[in-house]
A protein has these predicted regions:
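Conserved phosphate-binding/catalytic region of the ribokinase-like
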Residues: 1-19, 33-37, 49-52, 252-364
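Hydrophobic anchor at the start of a short beta-strand
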Residues: 5, 111-112, 139, 212-214, ...
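Short beta-strand/turn micro-motifs composed of small residues
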Residues: 9, 115-118, 217, 266
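Short Gly/aromatic-enriched secondary-structure transition segments
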Residues: 20-29
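Substrate-binding N-lobe of the ribokinase-like
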Residues: 35-151, 344, 362-363
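Short acidic-glycine loop/turn motifs at beta-strand connectors
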Residues: 110, 157-160, 274-281
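Conserved phosphate-binding/catalytic loop of the ribokinase/pfkB sugar-kinase fold
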Residues: 113, 143-144, 152-199
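Conserved beta-alpha-beta core of the PfkB/ribokinase-like small-molecule kinase fold
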Residues: 188-261, 267-278
Length: 364
């Protein structure tokens, strides 16, 4: 099935910094898997300090050739309750790659991306456009004249499982609610709003013309008190997020009842789906993580691989989102296939997703 997928969300420059050990002591809980906004503090030196409001600091000895930043980055909020003091880690390697959930979903779904960039002469915007071209992603952009493109410092502990994207934002946040209207009149099989501010996502998902509507939030969407996710949950056919994001949402039970399908992923613990069966009964399915015989190389993009494979499987098997119900067997089939896709992407350290044929082979 060839889906006409339209993805509204960011494409970032991801400056990926891989480190040699967990970002928090294992005794304090599972690996970090959340995004946080940051601001540059004092610059200079050989190390990079990530400091949250509670005073917890991760000090990173930077690898050879690191292009910056160095010095201190102030995180907007704490990254783990109970974490105090300093933790020293060493940078192993770094790379610049294409990032952003919009770019990820557009690639995984073979869809068209609609995103915001800075002006034509903005260096980061130029790099992002080049990376989109290199990945052969079809895209259209809104140029924001007075903001540089958004970018991310992504700190990954690789096999230890931490993924801490630190965002330097402003470009997409500057958009008006109707900025994407020229494209919202186009009919499509699937419309995805990925990691955009809630006020933008609500406008995109409530517009007519899409057979299926997916919301892929970031942590900031769950924390948004000015525009609650519950206020537009009725416009969402599939909401897919990780457990830490889900548990941050204050009115999550209201949201769970208003979306057609909720999927919560939990890394090596597997995933949970909540939905309504054709008999009108509430359905719940848990599926374990797909078995692996080696540690992950990188956990970045596992969530996008899972959600994109899950929804494409449902639609290819004839699910009708307008009905508001779905058969349990179909949900289980889609979750198993999605778990395999997420497991395969753990072997990648670069931008990309497993082909359907690779998923088929893994499931044999």
């Amino acid at each position: 099935m060839n889906l006409r997928a339209m993805v509204f969300g960011p494409a970032y420059l991801d400056r990926v910094l891989r480190v040699d050990r967990p970002l928090v002591a294992p005794a304090l809980g599972p690996p970090i898997d959340q995004s946080v906004d940051g601001s540059l503090g004092f610059a200079g030196g050989r190390n990079l300090e990530l400091t949250d409001p509670s005073g917890y600091t991760i000090e990173i000895a930077l690898p050879s050739g690191w292009p910056g930043p160095s010095g201190r980055i102030e995180l907007e909020r704490g990254i783990r309750a109970g974490a105090t003091g300093r933790r020293a880690v060493s940078g192993l390697s770094w790379t610049d790659d294409l990032g952003g959930m919009g770019a990820g979903y557009a690639t995984a779904l073979a869809g068209t991306l609609y995103c915001a960039l800075g002006p034509e002469d903005d260096p980061i915007s130029q790099v992002i456009a080049s990376l989109l071209d290199r990945q052969a992603i079809a895209y259209s952009t809104i140029r924001v004249a007075d903001h540089g493109a958004d970018w991310t410092l992504l700190v990954s502990s690789g096999m230890h499982g931490d993924k801490l994207p630190i965002g330097f934002r402003g470009c997409h946040a500057a958009l008006a609610a109707g900025s994407f209207d020229p494209w919202l009149s186009l009919p499509c099989d699937l419309r995805v709003a990925a990691a955009l501010p809630n006020r933008l996502a609500a406008h995109i998902l409530s517009a007519p013309g899409a057979s299926c509507r997916v919301f892929a939030p970031a942590m900031r969407n769950m924390r948004d008190q000015a525009y609650l996710l519950s206020s537009f949950a009725g416009s969402i056919d599939l909401l897919c997020c990780n457990r830490q994001e889900w548990e941050t949402l204050d009115d999550r039970e209201e949201v769970a009842w208003r979306v057609s399908i909720l999927v919560v992923t939990d890394g090596p613990s597997g995933s949970l789906a909540r939905f309504t069966t054709p008999q009108g009964e509430p359905g719940t399915i848990r599926v374990p993580a797909f078995p692996r015989n080696r540690p992950p190389r990188d956990t970045n993009r596992a969530g996008e691989a899972f959600a994109a494979t899950f929804i494409s499987t449902l639609l290819s098997q004839g699910w009708q989102p307008a009905s508001g119900v779905v058969a349990a067997d179909l949900v289980r089939q889609a979750m198993i296939r999605a778990a395999a896709a997420a497991a395969l992407v753990l072997d990648r350290t670069d931008f990309g997703f497993p082909a359907p044929e690779a998923i088929d082979i893994a499931l044999r």
